[in-house]
Swiss-Prot record:
Protein name according to UniProt: Shikimate dehydrogenase (NADP(+))
Gene name of this polypeptide: aroE
UniProt-recorded Gene Ontology molecular function terms: NADP binding; shikimate 3-dehydrogenase (NADP+) activity
Lineage, broadest ranks: Bacteria, Bacillati, Bacillota, Bacilli, Bacillales
InterPro entries: Aminoacid_DH-like_N_sf (IPR046346), NAD(P)-bd_dom_sf (IPR036291), SDH_C (IPR041121), Shikimate_DH (IPR011342), Shikimate_DH-bd_N (IPR013708), Shikimate_DH_fam (IPR022893), Shikm_DH/Glu-tRNA_Rdtase (IPR006151)
Organism: Bacillus subtilis (strain 168)
Enzyme class: oxidoreductase
Positions contributing to NADP(+) binding: E78, G127, A128, G129, G130, A131, N151, R152, T153, L154, E155, K156, I219, G242
Gene3D superfamilies: Leucine Dehydrogenase, chain A, domain 1, NAD(P)-binding Rossmann-like Domain
Length: 280
């Protein structure tokens, strides 16, 4: 009998997860199917009961359920406990266990463009939401030289820095302060929705003072090359688009469910094809 996998969220109609996971199942000769399920917030508990009853082997969790689903699972892995959010659920016997692959997915994509270890680099992150939390806590485990956060709401950024009390080389900045200090950073990571379709001309901050050796990352992947990444490319800076994080976190979920490693480059090609884009 086919094993069933899927993604739950709302909205979910434009999810590319079924495309990449079904292609990976087919490539590896695994008898399974991955389906997108639209689940309203007030239907989440019933949806989890359905997942149990139907014997679903694995589920990805997206907006708005990443936090609330934790109430309905049997166990939460340390990766998700630290973040206070779940993006992957795996059936383990008769138990449903929650994981989070977002932070590790970003770091895996980042490591492909770095020429130094994280411990030798200074980071600036723009944003303090759920994705920012995953990225910050994962990178900090690798003890960077410095990791500052800038956000429109300083209090929200401050709360995020407090999630890692043992890491001290961190500071909360306004956007203006970050722009003035930009030359200090080796890696600049944008984690908000600024520049996402349809507002494709928006940028979160100016890269005017960025160091010539800086790497600029944007987790937005629609468009693939955001206005921020275009500005970085025009300055001759190395860039990392959001497709990398999306594909790497998906691959980690796939491995959790099947024990097998999917073809990352094929996943990436599918996503780029669906977006109608080209590589940066």
């Amino acid at each position: 009998m086919k094993k069933l996998y899927g993604v739950i969220g709302n909205p979910i109609g434009h999810s590319m997860s079924p495309d990449i996971h079904n292609a990976s199942l087919k490539d590896l000769g695994l008898d399974g199917h991955y389906h997108a399920f639209k689940v309203e917030e007030n239907d989440l508990e019933d949806a989890v009961k359905g997942i149990r009853a139907l014997g679903v082997q694995g589920i990805n969790v997206t907006v708005p359920h990443k936090v609330s689903i934790m109430d309905y699972l049997d166990h939460i892995d340390e990766s998700a406990k630290v973040l206070g959010a779940v993006n992957t659920v795996r059936r383990e016997g008769d138990k449903l266990v929650g994981y989070n692959t977002d932070g590790e997915g970003f770091v895996k994509s980042l490591m492909k463009v770095l020429d130094k270890p994280i411990s030798e680099l200074s980071f600036l992150m723009i944003g303090a939401g759920g994705a920012a939390r995953a990225i910050f806590t994962t990178i900090v485990r690798n003890t960077p030289k410095k990791f500052d956060i800038c956000n429109r709401t300083l209090e929200k950024a401050k709360r995020l820095t407090e999630a890692t009390p043992s890491f001290h080389n961190k500071e909360v900045l306004s956007i203006k302060e970050a722009e003035e200090r930009l030359e200090q950073y080796d890696v600049i990571i944008h984690t908000t929705s600024v520049g996402m379709y349809p507002n494709v001309d928006d940028v979160p901050l100016s890269l005017q003072r960025a160091a010539s050796s800086a790497v600029v990352c944007d987790i937005v992947y629609n468009p693939i090359q955001t206005a921020l990444l275009k500005e970085a490319s025009q300055k001759g800076l190395k860039t990392l688009d959001g497709v990398g994080m999306f594909v790497e976190q998906a691959a980690l979920s796939f491995q959790l469910w099947t024990g097998q490693e999917p073809n990352i480059e094929k996943m990436r090609s599918i996503v780029i094809g669906k977006l109608g884009g080209t590589e940066c």
